[in-house]
Amino acid sequence: MRRRRAMRHGTRHLAGRVSEKRRRPSGQPRRNALTAPTTTSPALSLPLQGSVGSGGGNALDDVRLVKRRLIALGFSWLSEDTSINQATIRAIRLFQAITQGFQRVEGAGVDGLVEAGGNTHRWLEASNAPRWRLMPAGGASEDGFRNTEVLDQTGDDHDWGTEWLAHTITAAGTSYRTGYLSAHPAAAPITVNDASKPRGGPTPDHQTHQTGMCCDLRVPRTDGTAPGNTTLHDPTYDRDVMRAMLSAFRAEPLVRRILFNDPVLVREGFCTALAGHDDHAHAEITAPAPVVAEGDS
């Protein structure tokens, strides 16, 4: 069931859709994922006359509007023309999966069709519409995190995701630095590994990681490193540091769940156990509510 590939930077994993009853660790404030701060721009009017995409009416002006908007949001592999091809439909499906908080490009509403006035149209017009981008690298002492996927693994390409995930990583890094690392400067930084492929979609290395809404975190050691080949059973595993890292992520409003098998941290409410998560944690986010112009339905 698990797909494994031997590699120098750690074991990849399958993160399935496991329901989680959220428990807040003691002292951690309650969050509301629907009101999370995200990067925004003015709401955009996208006056579609009909549907665009798979099986749509695909009027030329409508197609042009949708593709220009997707390109502006970072789906830059699309061509700015009026063609509806498989790349366009896949980009629409990826956008739909993201806005529904899915970890795979599948599920209800992921049909590759933008209906005028529908949910996908509404999200395209939203000021906080998801932007697709290269994940932040970090690595500086003030960042609190290091993205080894971007900085070190030049032969790998799981470097991409949503602006929402990028914000979550950088904010968690800042929180970890000020809340823990400043008092324990010899501790490892949060070490980020895989997010998603450059155009999202399925990857042979993961069951999820398709929508830029999750990333992996390496297990820290007591020597201040996180080389990627450490498990929670290793005598050098640093539980206190991992607790601080997971706490920083859980404090972020869009974080939906964290998968990691340390039974102590599971009992404390920082994470949920799932097979395959002894050697890394898997952090998932969900989507905020769309922010649209006043008067829009």
Predicted regions and their residues:
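Cationic, amphipathic, low-complexity alpha-helical segments enriched
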Residues: 1-24, 28
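Acidic, Ser/Thr/Pro/Gly-enriched interdomain connector segments
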Residues: 27-82
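Acidic/histidine-rich, surface-exposed loop or edge segments in extracytoplasmic proteins
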Residues: 41-52, 73-74, 132-160, 221-231
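Acidic helix-start/capping segments at beta-turn-to-alpha-helix junctions
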Residues: 83-91, 113-121, 185-204, 261-268
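Extracellular LysM carbohydrate-binding repeats and other cell-envelope/extracellular binding modules
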Residues: 86, 90, 94, 98-131
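Active-site acidic/histidine clusters and adjacent loop/turn architecture
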Residues: 130-192, 241-248, 255
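Short, surface-exposed glycine/acidic/tryptophan-bearing loops
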Residues: 203-223
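Catalytic cores and adjacent binding grooves of peptidoglycan-active enzymes
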Residues: 219, 224-297
